[in-house]
Swiss-Prot record:
Protein name per the record: tRNA (guanine-N(1)-)-methyltransferase
Catalyses which reaction(s): guanosine(37) in tRNA + S-adenosyl-L-methionine = N(1)-methylguanosine(37) in tRNA + S-adenosyl-L-homocysteine + H(+)
Source organism of this protein record: Salmonella paratyphi C (strain RKS4594)
Gene3D superfamilies: 3.40.1280.10, tRNA(m1g37)methyltransferase, domain 2
GO biological process: tRNA N1-guanine methylation
NCBIfam families, per the entry: PRK00026.1, trmD
Disulfide bridge map: none
Lineage, uppermost ranks: Bacteria, Pseudomonadati, Pseudomonadota, Gammaproteobacteria, Enterobacterales
Cited PANTHER family: TRNA (GUANINE-N(1)-)-METHYLTRANSFERASE
EC number from the UniProt entry: 2.1.1.228
Length: 255
């Protein structure tokens, strides 16, 4: 997969190219990340990339020419079929469904804004889609771009050590992940649930699904509103709710 980055701070992306899952993907040739800085496409000695906005107001805007030329260079390197994305608070909010959708593209170009944003004409002429990682303000598009890269890379075959990992991640099926445990079996009186030690894979799958449903109901109930639960899922969720109510009643009685 090819990902081009247009950013005033391309060195920030070493966090992606040099470390962890994405770093291994780059090293193994599964992920090709290249970057272009608009400063390299300026024509004045100060390498100016920003200017005051027409109409006044605080802050500066990224200028058209250096940014557009950097995008064109990234497009030329990517070849035909590259989708150009601008990381923007005005964009579609990134979720697991969106990540899965973006992962179907073999070529992405991510444009990172700075200052108060970019000239609207760049968006009109060069950008295919705008994406946001949340309703809050950041200093630039680099961190959102890194978030997008990390999440999309998990869908590239061979990137994860276990192919089931991406499937079993939180949100992969619209639910939060279930609890996980490793050694020791007992920690300060807290024991691993016996079913996980049973070796009964059918019961383990059932327990994990019940916990995933229950955790979603407790922490992100709005996610369940968009799901059409199967008969098994509905039954397991009902069981979880009953067990949770019993635990709460027991806890209240001990208080």
């Amino acid at each position: 997969m090819f990902i081009g980055i247009v950013s005033l701070f391309p060195e920030m992306f070493r966090a992606i190219t040099d470390y962890g899952v994405t770093g291994r993907a780059v090293k193994n040739g599964l992920l090709n990340i290249q970057s272009w800085s608009p400063r390299d496409f300026t024509h004045d000695r100060h390498r100016t990339v920003d200017d005051r906005p027409y109409g006044g107001g605080p802050g500066m805007l990224m200028m058209v020419q250096p940014l557009r030329d950097a995008i064109h260079a990234a497009k030329a390197a990517a070849g035909e079929g590259a989708k150009v994305i601008y990381l923007s608070p005005q964009g579609r909010k990134l979720d697991q469904a969106g990540v899965s959708e973006l992962a179907t593209n073999q070529k992405l170009i991510l444009v990172c804004g700075r200052y108060e944003g970019v000239d609207e004409r760049v968006i009109q002429t060069e950008i295919d889609e705008e994406w946001s990682i949340g309703d809050y303000v950041l200093s630039g598009g680099e961190l959102p771009a890194m978030t997008l890269i990390d999440s999309v890379a998990r869908f590239i075959p061979g990137v994860l050590g276990h192919e089931a990992s991406a499937i079993e991640d939180s949100f992969a099926d619209g639910l939060l992940d279930c609890p996980h445990y490793t050694r020791p079996e007992v920690l300060e009186g807290m024991e691993v649930p016996p079913v996980l030690l049973s070796g009964n894979h059918a019961e383990i799958r059932r327990w994990r699904l019940k916990q995933s449903l229950g955790r979603t109901w407790l922490r992100r109930p709005e996610l369940l509103e968009n799901l059409a639960l199967t008969e098994e899922q509905a039954r397991l969720l009902a069981e979880f709710k009953t067990e949770h109510a019993q635990q709460q009643h027991k806890h209240d009685g001990m208080a």
